[in-house]
Amino acid sequence: MEFAPVSPPDGHAAAAARARQDTLTKPRGALGRLEDLSIWVASCQGQCPPRQFQRARIVVFAGDHGVARSGVSAYPPQLTAQMVANIDRGGAAINALASIADATIRIADLAVDADPLSQQIGIHKVRRGSGDIAIQDALTEDETARAIIAGQRIADEEVDRGADLLIAGDIGIGNTTAAAVLVAALTNAEPVAVVGFGTGIDDASWARKTAAVRDALCRIRLVLPDPVGLLRCCGGADLAAMAGFCAQAAVRRTPLLLDGMVVTAAALVAERLAPGSWQWWQAGHQSTEPGHALALAALDLDPILDLRMRLGEGTGATAALLVLRAAVAALTSMTTFAEAGVAGTSTSPPS
């Protein structure tokens, strides 16, 4: 799989945003991380001050995983299709958060083990479910390529329709197990260091999940460091599509907010598919899954929020969008000392 080269965000716009921050009516650095985020947005948009986001778009990638049949989740596999329907009806957590964050939602069924809910939702569907990664490949070579291309196309479709910020989310029973394998493989971590309690599993289920990750890691070492091979062996169509989506967003110079463990695991692979992509991403939050912190550290991303969330769907990233909007608003709407006629136009006043 080949992606076009990723060019970095605009350094001149970043410098202009940093300089403007230092002239606003506040002590220098007083807005903390909000200042850093506003500079990042300006660099992604190539202008200072940056524009407020007009078309933030959430894409929830859905897929089932064969490993779920091994008792690694607190919920049955058929819940994935039911949750897709719930999001489509507007009744899920992501719907509530998207509404207040002024973002819209698209569901992409890549591998739900059921017929697509609609033609639009299933237009990029690759297959139903995936192989049990503890004992067999998740996908064939052809399915892996199709899933990555699907993610690329979804990113292109959204950017071509005017999306100025993308959020990647996930839904799928068993997907944190596949994500844990990818994170462990790409950070050289032991299974016990990356496996969390996911949907709220008990100790026995955690032990089964850890064993499944261990067995999958034995298989995945045969394909390291090939990113496409990793997705084929121990990913799934949803994770492969997420990787293609995250990489293509960077190729298209469109800022993207990562969500939790599953999306960040896919992003680790995306960075290997299209080096430099990470510059176009922010980590919306840090989840309670232990492997998530390892994945974020590997990408050198500092999470915007830490609210002990572990839901997925894009909820953590969508909550962070409100913070990102605040950062843009402050840089754009605040007056400078000179504009306000306030003393201290050369240097910021003491705090």
From Swiss-Prot:
Pathway named in the protein's UniProt entry: Nucleoside biosynthesis; alpha-ribazole biosynthesis; alpha-ribazole from 5,6-dimethylbenzimidazole: step 1/2
Keyword Glycosyltransferase found: yes
InterPro entries per the UniProt record, alphabetical: Nict_dMeBzImd_PRibTrfase, Nict_dMeBzImd_PRibTrfase_bact, Nict_dMeBzImd_PRibTrfase_N, Nict_dMeBzImd_PRibTrfase_sf
GO term, biological process aspect, one: cobalamin biosynthetic process
Claim: Glycosyltransferase is one of the keywords in the record: yes
EC number(s) on file: 2.4.2.21
Active site: residue positions: 313 (proton acceptor)
Catalytic activity: 5,6-dimethylbenzimidazole + nicotinate beta-D-ribonucleotide = alpha-ribazole 5'-phosphate + nicotinate + H(+)
A Pfam family per the record: DBI_PRT
GO terms for MF: nicotinate-nucleotide-dimethylbenzimidazole phosphoribosyltransferase activity
Keyword annotations of the record: Cobalamin biosynthesis, Glycosyltransferase, Transferase
The family this protein is said to belong to: Belongs to the CobT family.
The protein's role, per its UniProt record: Catalyzes the synthesis of alpha-ribazole-5'-phosphate from nicotinate mononucleotide (NAMN) and 5,6-dimethylbenzimidazole (DMB).
Protein name per Swiss-Prot or TrEMBL: Nicotinate-nucleotide--dimethylbenzimidazole phosphoribosyltransferase
Taxon lineage: Bacteria, Bacillati, Actinomycetota, Actinomycetes, Mycobacteriales
Gene: cobT
